[in-house]
């Protein structure tokens, strides 16, 4: 059995937590995030920590409590420090630019690709082949990064495409004659 749920989530100074039944909202310097907690989980706020326990009558209570703890910990980190995700564009003529809340991509198609960013997410391009996404919500940042990568996934022969900065693309050998 995993023991993730047994560890409390420490609430740092400057973070405000509101528990209202199964709804929780966490507010910090980077914004406010809210989430509905699973019915199998009971969350208690004591001192500067959130504790988790399963409710009676649920088979997967500890599993849901561990998941809830991980999600709320990510919310606390998001509103205090925030999350970043870096993408790289590999390929001749592949470029990225940010205009307002729209990421413009040139990925070898006959048309440029414009991707609108959701609220709470900002993007910047330190160079034409790099995109840095920043925001408080870890799930939304990962989703936006996956959507940008899906326009041109790294191909296995030359490795061209949009990849995560820490991604290792395994390349295949070309066909022998």
Swiss-Prot record:
**Sorted alphabetically, which InterPro entries does this protein's record hold?**
Ribosomal_uL6-like, Ribosomal_uL6-like_a/b-dom_sf, Ribosomal_uL6_a/b-dom, Ribosomal_uL6_bac-type, Ribosomal_uL6_CS
Q: Say if the entry is tagged with keyword rRNA-binding.
A: yes
Q: Give a GO cellular-component term.
A: cytosolic large ribosomal subunit
Which Pfam families has this protein been placed in?
Ribosomal_L6
> What processes does the entry annotate via GO biological process terms?
cytoplasmic translation
* PROSITE patterns listed in its UniProt record: RIBOSOMAL_L6_1
* Record's keyword annotation contains Transferase: no
Keywords, sorted A to Z: Ribonucleoprotein, Ribosomal protein, RNA-binding, rRNA-binding
Which Gene Ontology MF annotations are present?
Answer: rRNA binding; structural constituent of ribosome
As for family, the record states: Belongs to the universal ribosomal protein uL6 family.
Q: What does this protein do?
A: This protein binds to the 23S rRNA, and is important in its secondary structure. It is located near the subunit interface in the base of the L7/L12 stalk, and near the tRNA binding site of the peptidyltransferase center.
Please describe the quaternary structure of this protein: Part of the 50S ribosomal subunit.
What the entry lists under HAMAP family is as follows: Ribosomal_uL6_B
NCBIfam families per UniProt: L6_bact
How is this protein named in the record?
Answer: Large ribosomal subunit protein uL6
């Amino acid at each position: 059995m995993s023991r993730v749920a047994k560890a409390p989530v420490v609430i740092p100074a400057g973070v405000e937590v509101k528990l209202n039944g199964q709804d929780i909202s966490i507010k910090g310097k980077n914004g406010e995030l809210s989430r509905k907690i699973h019915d199998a989980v009971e969350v208690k706020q004591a001192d500067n920590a959130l504790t988790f326990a399963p409710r009676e009558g649920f088979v997967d209570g500890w599993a849901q409590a561990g998941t809830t703890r991980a999600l709320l910990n990510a919310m606390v980190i998001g509103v205090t420090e925030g999350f970043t995700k870096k993408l790289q564009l590999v390929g001749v003529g592949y470029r990225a630019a940010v205009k307002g809340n729209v990421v413009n991509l040139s990925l070898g198609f006959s048309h440029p690709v414009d991707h609108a960013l959701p609220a709470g997410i900002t993007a910047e391009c330190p160079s034409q082949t790099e995109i840095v996404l920043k925001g408080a919500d870890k799930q939304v940042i990962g989703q936006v990064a996956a959507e940008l990568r899906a326009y041109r996934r790294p191909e296995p022969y030359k490795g061209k495409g949009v990849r995560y900065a820490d991604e290792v693309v395994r390349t295949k050998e070309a066909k022998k004659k």
